[in-house]
Structures are given as C-alpha cells and as structure tokens.
C-alpha cells in the first residue's frame, strides 16, 4: 500500500499513506503537517498526475518548488511512495564560528548590495518575460514566433501591480525572489498561490497564445497541485493547438474541445484531462513526442523536443547557444544544464569569469 518516508534527524520510518493517495500536492503537504504536528516539516510529494502514470509528473517540494522534468514523480509513485517528509532539529557544528559568521556577513553585504537583488526581490524570474520578448526569444504559439503581442499583460510587472501580496524566499535562501499572490478574479475564487517562475508563466501564456494573466496563473497553480512538469504540459497543449490549426487534429479527436490558440475553456480542461488521463488527455499524458508518434500524419515534425524532453520557453533563434544546449545536453532540452549569458550580454569574456555582474544587466 502507499507510504511516505518520514525522516526526523537520524530516525527514519515509513508511514501509511493510504489516506494521502488521491490528494493533490497542497492537500498532501498540509495533511502531513497536521498528522505530525509540525508546520516546519519540509515535504516533497507527488500529486494525482504521478499516481495516474502521467509520464512527465514531477516531485513538488513545499507546494511550489518543482523537480519536474523527466518524470521522476511518475517513478516515485510507481513505487507507492507518496511523499518524503524531513525535519532536522539539531544544530550544525562549525569548526570556526567566528570566521563562518564573518563570511556570512560578507556574502550578505555582497548580495544585498548587488544590482540584481532589487529586481529579483520584485519580480524573480518573471522579469524574463519582458527581457526575452524584447529580443524575440519568448516562445509564442508553439514557437511560431519569438514575440508575444500580449507580453505586457502577462509580465512580471503585471503580476506585481495586480496580484502580488508579499515576497518570500525558499527554505534557507537569502534572496526572496518568490512571491505570494492573491488573484482576485470571479472565475477563480479564493485562488492564492506562490510564484510563478518564468517557465510555467510563459508556458501557460505566450506558448499557448493566451493573454489572460489570471487564467495562466490558474493553470500554473493546477499544474503544481497535480504535480506536473509545466514545460511538458504547455508543450503538449501548444503542439495540439498547432496540429488543430494545420488540420492534422480535429475537434472530434479532442473530445469536442476547440483547440484554437488561447481558448481558456479548452486550456483549463486539458490540464485536468492530462492529470487524470481522461479522453484526449490520456494521449497527451504520454508527452508530445509520444502523442505525435501515436497520431502520425506529420505531427511528429511539429514536436518541440530534444531526446524526448520538451523544449523550454526560450526560442533558440534568438538565443542560439540554447540550440547547442538542447542538442548536447545529456537529457535533452534543458535550461538547467546551460545558461548562455554571454549571448544576452554580447560579452565574449563571459564564461571566463564570474558572470554575476553581466547577469545583473538583464
């Protein structure tokens, strides 16, 4: 039966998780906190997508941090492991407390005085919406173009002005580049969430032709709750929309859904259908490459992937080093394996020294 792993200091045990199976990431996290009586427990868990065998289900930490790529959540759920809960209570021993404290203060001063700190504090990675759109690198309508006409409506600045409640940092991190949002929209009552980061934000807006910010944020929240790789989900949906646009897929094959770009009702329905492998979502839950191999009809040529891993939200025609990254990275299209800041900066010396100052310009 399902279990979760509970680690408290050096005591490790497997606990019954049958009552957690079928719950989403947020529900699971809060249930574990309640069961163990400690809200400071760090929880890494899977959602319903992993339980249902969605091939790109991830592991979500503390409800919002996603180890999402390559389906590790799916693998975890296949072992009947619902979550890993960790709590450390013992002090960390330091050989030289005085020097250690001095180094912390020195690093804190450098961080807080850095030009990048202020923009990270305000916008986090969502600052990239405006930056990438400006240079033609924002994945739009399944990479048909690199600029989105509604970028200003779905930017980090738009989130800050409309929905931001307060900033926050990840566990033990000095830089509070994340944020709590309260989305006041009659369609999504009581929608409160952390984030988003650039990848899911762009994935559920420009990539699928959606200029409705609140809708995009709702999709990000659902993707996290179900425990899915937002890059993969947005690729599956945008691939299907382009196939529909080109006449490769019909409305009947998509459960009667209108796959026109930016159709909010369709987008929300597909996120649910994929997570629960229902109808057309069962096909997409195999990933865009797998879905295309099953559909055929030339749809294989439309899939944006490398080695089966869906391409992230940056158009390599604008940032060409990303094309090299996508080609040679061991697991495919992976923005975590290469960050070609020299191409943003135009500084050929980048990569031969600390690039923090260059990154701060963007």
Predicted features by range, described:
Residues 1-19, 23:
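Long, structured ligand/cofactor-binding scaffold of large enzymes
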Residues 33-36, 40-70, 76-362:
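Extended C-terminal regions of large enzymes
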Residues 25-29:
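Active-site-proximal gating segment of KS-fold condensing enzymes and close homologs
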């Amino acid at each position: 039966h399902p279990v979760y792993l509970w680690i408290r200091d050096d005591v490790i045990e497997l606990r019954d998780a049958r009552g957690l199976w079928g719950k989403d990431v947020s529900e699971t996290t809060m249930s574990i906190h309640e069961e163990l009586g400690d809200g400071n427990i760090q929880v890494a868990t899977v959602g319903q997508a992993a339980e249902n065998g969605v091939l790109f289900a991830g592991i979500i930490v503390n409800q919002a941090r996603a180890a999402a790529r390559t389906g590790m959540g799916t693998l975890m759920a296949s072992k009947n492991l619902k979550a890993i809960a960790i709590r450390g209570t013992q002090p960390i021993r330091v050989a030289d407390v005085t020097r250690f404290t001095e180094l912390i203060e020195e690093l804190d001063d450098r961080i807080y005085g850095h030009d990048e700190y202020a923009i990270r504090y305000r916008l986090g990675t969502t600052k990239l919406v405006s930056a990438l759109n400006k240079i033609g690198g924002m994945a739009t309508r399944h990479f048909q173009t690199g600029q989105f006409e509604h970028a200003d409506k779905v930017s980090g600045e738009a989130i800050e002005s409309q929905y931001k409640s307060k900033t926050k940092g990840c566990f033990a991190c000095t830089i509070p580049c994340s944020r709590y949002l309260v989305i006041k929209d009659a369609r999504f009552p009581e929608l409160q969430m952390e984030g988003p980061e650039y990848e899911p934000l762009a994935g559920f807006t420009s990539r699928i032709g959606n200029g409705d910010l609140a809708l995009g944020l709702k999709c990000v929240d659902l993707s996290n709750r179900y425990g899915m790789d937002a890059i993969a989900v947005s690729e599956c949906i945008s691939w299907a929309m382009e196939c529909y646009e080109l006449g490769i897929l019909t409305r009947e094959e998509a459960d009667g859904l209108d796959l026109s770009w930016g159709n909010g009702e369709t987008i929300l329905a597909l996120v649910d259908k994929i997570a629960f492998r229902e109808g057309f979502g069962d096909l997409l839950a195999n990933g865009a490459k797998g879905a295309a191999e099953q559909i055929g009809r030339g749809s294989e040529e439309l899939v944006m992937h490398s080695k089966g891993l869906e391409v992230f939200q940056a158009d390599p025609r604008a940032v060409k080093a990303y094309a090299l990254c996508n080609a040679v990275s061991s697991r495919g299209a992976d923005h975590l394996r290469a960050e070609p800041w020299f191409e943003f900066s135009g500084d050929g010396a980048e990569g031969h020294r600390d690039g923090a100052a260059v990154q701060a310009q963007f």
